[in-house]
């Protein structure tokens, strides 16, 4: 029972993450029946982006505590069948070193993005914490407008690492610019921009 409650919380955080990344969440995904939590594989989700139906994502929940290369290959084949270019793998414990290497190879060769999150990382939605400011991913047009307005180069922007927890939550990759809105006692709100490196 405790395991089901844990999975419910993880699934809720994943749905919030997909929604924040602007993927369409169906009513079925939101009201997923509790009885279906028998197997983690049943929790697999497929979503498409609101403004671009060709941009799709899979979320996999492997049954085994440690994920190996064979499972990674299986997930890549599933992605190829639906022409998905991005996936999130939610692992119970860890991913084997060979599987990590396979993740990197598939990402380079097949032009797909495979992200890995531990279940413990998804028990709490970090963006809902009071100390984490609001992050907004800028489009290419908004990024160009920002650089021309302030007459600066991309390299002059402050940086955020790709392995930063919030950057991972939003699925940022190199070159993305994020707008960070913080509350300020003197100015009302304080806006900064960061380049993902």
UniProtKB/Swiss-Prot annotation:
Return the protein name. Answer: DNA-directed RNA polymerases I, II, and III subunit rpabc1
**Any Pfam family the entry gives:** RNA_pol_Rpb5_N
- Mind listing the GO biological process terms from this record? transcription by RNA polymerase I; transcription by RNA polymerase II; transcription by RNA polymerase III; transcription elongation by RNA polymerase I; tRNA transcription by RNA polymerase III
This protein's species is Dictyostelium discoideum
Subunit: Component of the RNA polymerase I (Pol I), RNA polymerase II (Pol II) and RNA polymerase III (Pol III) complexes consisting of at least 13, 12 and 17 subunits, respectively. In RNA Pol II, this subunit is present in 2-fold molar excess over the other subunits.
Q: Which GO terms describe its cellular component?
A: RNA polymerase I complex; RNA polymerase II, core complex; RNA polymerase III complex
HAMAP family (UniProt xref): RNApol_Rpo5_RPB5
Reading the lineage from the top rank, the first entry is Eukaryota
Compartments where found: Nucleus
UniProt-recorded Gene Ontology molecular function terms: DNA binding; DNA-directed RNA polymerase activity
Q: What is the lineage of its organism?
A: Eukaryota, Amoebozoa, Evosea, Eumycetozoa, Dictyostelia
Alphabetically sorted, this entry's keywords are: DNA-directed RNA polymerase, Nucleus, Transcription
PANTHER family in alphabetical order: DNA-DIRECTED RNA POLYMERASES I, II, AND III SUBUNIT RPABC1 (PTHR10535:SF0)
What role does it play? Answer: DNA-dependent RNA polymerase catalyzes the transcription of DNA into RNA using the four ribonucleoside triphosphates as substrates. Common component of RNA polymerases I, II and III which synthesize ribosomal RNA precursors, mRNA precursors and many functional non-coding RNAs, and small RNAs, such as 5S rRNA and tRNAs, respectively. Pol II is the central component of the basal RNA polymerase II transcription machinery. Pols are composed of mobile elements that move relative to each other.
